[in-house]
Amino acid sequence: MKIDIIENRAECIIFSSQFGSGSAVWCGGDMTLPGSYDVEIDFDSEYIWGENVFYSNVPEESISLCNGVNKINSKVISIDGDIVVISLGCDVIMVEVSGAGVISNEHYIFFNSPAEMTSVTPFSN
């Protein structure tokens, strides 16, 4: 995913992307502010279907930041056990979701990811 880093805070960065704005832990070396980076994004919270992961009625992929929490809306590509593969544009992301067996492919889901449980790792600087 291509992101533009807007701000570097003590614990996390604030970024913007074609999907919206978010906050995450930076898992790379030095960065340039402002700076653009191609990154891998990971959501590492404990997700449980029906408790903090739900179907979405909004058929679009987005990231928004509200009170330090990333709100993710994404399309389900596939499910393998408790691993849900989602897309944000051309980017494919695996998220572990307990009870994922009831989720259907090609539907959109919504979940929250606190900034401290979201990480971005640059592919190159």
Where are these regions (language model features)?
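Short, compositionally biased
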Residues: G50-C66, P122-N125
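Flexible glycine-rich surface loops and low-complexity tracts that mediate binding to linear polymers
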Residues: I3-D4, P34-I48, S74, S104-F123
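Acidic (E/D-rich), amphipathic helical modules within compact regulatory domains
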Residues: A10-Y55
